[in-house]
């Protein structure tokens, strides 16, 4: 009967449900407390005795993957942190609790040696040219204990030679007495020299752009979108209620290149449930720092309990972000409107994902998530007989499967009526330019996940303040009952004349060069006890 009327019955269940175990992300590494790869036991014992190494003071906050190395950052918030920029040799340590190896070496992790070392690193980024971007905050301590032995400095390493190829100190005009920068986004244009980095000043309320080619930076400050929302400063994580009401612009992600040759930068203040956006055409232009207010776009709120500190977007426009209040990782497909019904949860774990501090997507479209129980570390006491820090991984396709972010999911578009591409692609046309990047990394063997058991049937639409939505009839036509438009990606694109260009056509008009006379416009156990199909196939076969 429903088919005759052209309707599909879709059951939507609120996220206000009991906690569940994560089924998609798989634990790769875990620690009760961090350990470092000292040159020998004698030096390690000396560091322990002197207080240069205090294991209980080390908290990992950032993760990034490249080749056979998994980078982990450990800020010097407390005494006894022997190295801030480290990595795991994944050839030697497939799983377990490996020692962290200082990168590129021990000497380069000396606190206070401003010109030659990194004092404190937070989140880092590997670009498609094989370079590791690290912002040294130059700080030791946190909050009222903070000292600044060194200035903020951009450090870039060549990962093929493991040498630093650039150090750039941020000038005083780009910071202020309240500056705290913990996030970075890297924008590569037509070649490796056409590179920009963007830094979010969380407590100084600004956005700093740096040009690799010009070796110069500038600051955007005159925007209220960088500030916290006074109604969103209350947090609840791991049973701890606390207020981070001063936390401004924090997490950032970059879209794929749009048809006008620029990307879209998405960002959120930490004390906020809302996302904002701006074209990198604006950020790349030093002359626009004071007159670009109306070039920034405010998007909708994500919904309740949706504070986020980290976000990343794939090259086909799928954004992943941590949901620190929900012990979860969320998703949004950027070809869809930024509204709660188009946000999904790819995984949740009320033990393993307590404060998923960082989320990354690597060159092979594998996702990496680091969780660290940060509020417990800062505001209470960690139990060092328990597992406190974890790094998870899964293929991106596995994570978004059966969520609203998977546009191939028939629940969000009827079969045999509209051909939905497997991935959102930019409109076809003559190339804007030819990228001149480094040679491609050797690709990992392609693994078929066809034999993997499907995850439990779950829905991922955000909770609506306790209201349960169920048994909604969705029309295969563009307009449903009572003239309500159906929330489907293909219908949204049809109504708005969008030709599947990700992240921006519904936000920014395609930029054209200026013309004369024309205004420019729960519960998770270890991997070997979980053995999801794809993990078992990849590592046991």
Swiss-Prot record:
Stated name of the protein: Protein yellow
Signal sequence coordinates: 1-21
UniProt keyword annotation of Glycosyltransferase present: no
Domain of life: Eukaryota
Localization, UniProt: Secreted
Single biological process term from Gene Ontology: regulation of adult chitin-containing cuticle pigmentation
PANTHER family linked to this entry: PROTEIN YELLOW, PROTEIN YELLOW-RELATED
Alphabetically ordered keywords of this record: Glycoprotein, Secreted, Signal
Glycosylation sites: 144, 215
Entry-linked InterPro entries: 6-blade_b-propeller_TolB-like (IPR011042), Royal_jelly/protein_yellow (IPR017996)
